[in-house]
Structure formats: structure tokens, C-alpha cells
Amino acid sequence: MATATIALGTDSIKMENGQGTAAKLGLPPLTPEQQEALQKAKKYAMEQSIKSVLVKQTIAHQQQQLTNLQMAAVTMGFGDPLSPLQSMAAQRQRALAIMCRVYVGSIYYELGEDTIRQAFAPFGPIKSIDMSWDSVTMKHKGFAFVEYEVPEAAQLALEQMNSVMLGGRNIKVGRPSNIGQAQPIIDQLAEEARAFNRIYVASVHQDLSDDDIKSVFEAFGKIKSCTLARDPTTGKHKGYGFIEYEKAQSSQDAVSSMNLFDLGGQYLRVGKAVTPPMPLLTPATPGGLPPAAAVAAAAATAKITAQEAVAGAAVLGTLATPGLVSPALTLAQPLGALPQAVMAAQAPGVITGVTPARPPIPVTIPSVGVVNPILASPPTLGLLEPKKEKEEEELFPESERPEMLSEQEHMSISGSSARHMVMQKLLRKQESTVMVLRNMVDPKDIDDDLEGEVTEECGKFGAVNRVIIYQEKQGEEEDAEIIVKIFVEFSVASETHKAIQDLNGRWFAGRKVVAEVYDQERFDNSDLSA
């Protein structure tokens, strides 16, 4: 073995085959920050690789379709061009594809694709967003193309998002420049759509059903059909659908009254249908890609998800999960690190929550449509006569007979009553299981036995999950008053209401106890200040 010795003062370092001690001992271990940066780099490279492959496959697929169409025009019928019917079908498909796209310009350079997606998502499901990037500055060029699943979503976005303030700039929203060649077909589709009294409804709450939407909208007239588009995989609706009325006036009233109406915490987007009725189909593969590309994308996504899970478990408690994380996880990151989620439809006329990396940028949207709906026809409430059991007739007079749940489920409601019932349905899903007891004890009365005593007493009304005794100082002064609030969480809401009914107003140690329902969301977020 060849060796060499380098003398440095009194010390010497022996080299073997040109390798020093550092090579023999190995590199020092990576710090947590370096490990995080490495994981980010790996995941970013994987994401870019997948995006590049999908773009190439999409382009190849589109070119293949164009080639097939051209070949069909030459070969079909021994050299004859496509038949008029086939040619018209192809033209309509191209026109529909163009109608689904909108151009978005004057985008602030700090805003990314996620911000654009979340700002435009309330109008309908987005198939793709195409942003052009400058390879030198590594920033987008200030414009993008948003492609929706249905033309009506693009039409609503065009009507309601043009000149909206986004990131400190008034964005420009319009049709793509190539719409001119398809304009005659688009006009023809619009003319056909006028023969049907259809409206498009988007931003529908996930917990609402077709019947719920129908009951709300039938206040404006008789409905022929009401269908929400379904995801064939999950079976859940995708947040949009179409309603067809018998009369044109009904559809006009519904659009003018229900656009931007708050239904279940989400503001509906309602507009006239711009295409004739077609089946609410979902492409079998995302974005119309060939099956191989869809499978590859799904596999790659699963791989990335697995990497995130492994990386998150390795650095739990010390590091935030790198890369694409859920909005809840981004709360752990420093302010300004990533854009926050955009709730584009939190209030009529306002888009809130858009926070680019720097600086903080307000996002506002001018008021559109009617915020407080004016009913075109007075709401009606008709109850179907329930079947009465013999025992009920004997026990209760007709005026005092209780309504059974099965009877309530068959009520026929419409108009404002329908909207109220739908809102109540959504609120029931969030009923609180937490009771707060006020004015029960003084701070000096708190001891180790108090929690057990409260648990035992409240256990008479149901299963108690936990008891929290909270002392709240009423000011910054040293001698500020301290009040005691006792929070009791039951297993179900009915037990909470039973306890409140029994304990509210009861006297305890010379004090009149106040028992109330406490907001579940506040309690879950450890906010005991209300």
C-alpha cells in the first residue's frame, strides 16, 4: 500500500491512497436544519419532475388527438372529410373547452398558484391553472389561465372577478385571445341555452343535498330538475350543480336574489346557464390525461405523501413539516413563511385571508349582486298530514299530539322557511357538548376536591369527559378581580342541555349559579375567555 507522510511542525498526517483522516472517519452528521432543507429539496425535485412529466404527457395526448382528427378527416369515407355532424361535434367540443378557460392578468408577483386557485375556486371546480414563469427571475410573468370543469364557472368568474383587488392590484379577468375563432359556436350554444330556464349554482356546502338546494330555490317557482354534480369516486357532490325551472322569470329571480346568499357559511355563486343541458360527467382521469399518466401521477402523489409522513414523524415536535402541508400545520410556521389559505367567499364583497410572503397584502372584492335576497314570491309552508297511531289519539288531544321524527322528515318546506331549516341542519352538526358554570365558587374556595365534586354532580346527567376549572383575571392590575369558570364537557349535546336545564339558577354556597352552553370551537381551541 502506498503511503505518504506530511509533516506539520511536530504532528504528521498519514495519507493512504490519497485519502485523509476526514474521509476515513466520515462526514459529520447533518443538523436538523440541514435535514429539513435536504427533505425540502428532494420533495421539490420530485414535484417538479412529476409536473414536467404530466405536462409532456398532456401535450403529447393533445397532439395525438389533433393528429387523429386530421387523419379521420382524410381517411373517413375514402378520402372524404368528416361528415357535417361529426365536424359540428368536434367544433362544439373545442368551443366548450375554450369557454371553460379565463385569462387572469396583472397578478402581483408574490402571489402563487395556490392563491389564484383559492380565489377562483368558489365559482366551480378548477381543472388546471397555467402560469408562465421567467426562467431568469424565477418569478411568474404576471398572468395565468384558469380552466374550469364547466363553462358556467368560467362565466361567473369573468363577471365577478374582473377588477377585483388581489395582492394590492386590480386583476384583469377576460376570455383567452383564441376565443374569436369559436365565437359563432359559442353564440349558438348560448342561443340553445336560452330555450332552457336553467341556472348554475356553485359554492354549495358539502353537507347539503340535492333536496336541500331544491327546497331553498323552489321559492322562486316550480323546479323541473335540481342536480348536483357528483364525484364518481367518493359519491359526494363537487360543490356545484344546475337547477331548471318551468318559467324563465323564476330563473331570473333566483339569480338576482340568491347570488352571494350565505347558506351554511358559504356564499352561493349563482348565474344563468350558458350551455344547453348536458350530463354532469366527470373525466375518468384528471385533466383528461391518458390512463397511464393518471396512474403515474397518483403513484407519485402517494409516494410524496408517504415521504411527508416519514419526514413528519422524524422531526415531530421540533420541525414543521416541509413542502406542501395542510393549512392547519402552517400555523406552526413563522409568519410570512408561506401564503395562508384564501377563503375567497367569506363575505359578500370581501376576499380575506390572502397573505403573500411579504408584504401583507389586503384583498378586496367589490360588492356583487344582492346580499339580502328579496323573494320573488312569498314563501309557503305546507305540512303533510302525518299518520296518527291509535294510541296517540287516545293519549293526546289533536292540538297537543307530539310530532315524531319520521313525520318531521316528510315536511314540505320552501322559501325562507327552507333556508332556515337548511341552516338549522348545518348548525345541528356543530352542537356543543360543553357547559360553563359561572358564579359557582370564589378563587379562595378552589381546592383539590372541587374537580371531583363537579364531576360527580354532573355525572348524574350523563358521561363527563373532562372538567376544567379556569381562573380569569379581569385586568392587568395586581389586585384585579379574578372570576372562576368551570367547564364541563359531556359526551353528547343532549346531556349538556339536560345539565344546564337542571343547574342554571340553582343556589350553591349562597351563590346563584349560571349554567350556559359554551362554544364548541372555542373550547376545542383552548379559548376559555368568552
UniProtKB/Swiss-Prot annotation:
It comes from the Eukaryota. Residues 48-530 are annotated as: Inhibits transcriptional repression, interaction with ERCC3 and apoptosis induction. Residues 387-408 are annotated as: Disordered. The modification Phosphothreonine is found at T31, T285. GO terms for cellular component: nucleus; ribonucleoprotein complex. Residues 100-178, 197-275, 433-520 form the RRM domain. The keyword Zinc-finger does not apply. The modification N6-acetyllysine is found at K222, K425. NCBIfam families: half-pint. Homodimer. Associates with the spliceosome. Found in a complex with RO60 and Y5 RNA. Found in a complex with FUBP1 and far upstream element (FUSE) DNA segment. Interacts directly with ERCC3. Interacts with CDK7 and GTF2H1. Interacts with SRSF11/P54. Interacts with ARGLU1; interaction may be involved in ARGLU1-mediated modulation of alternative splicing. DNA- and RNA-binding protein, involved in several nuclear processes such as pre-mRNA splicing, apoptosis and transcription regulation. In association with FUBP1 regulates MYC transcription at the P2 promoter through the core-TFIIH basal transcription factor. Acts as a transcriptional repressor through the core-TFIIH basal transcription factor. Represses FUBP1-induced transcriptional activation but not basal transcription. Decreases ERCC3 helicase activity. Is also involved in pre-mRNA splicing. Belongs to the RRM half pint family. This is Poly(U)-binding-splicing factor PUF60.
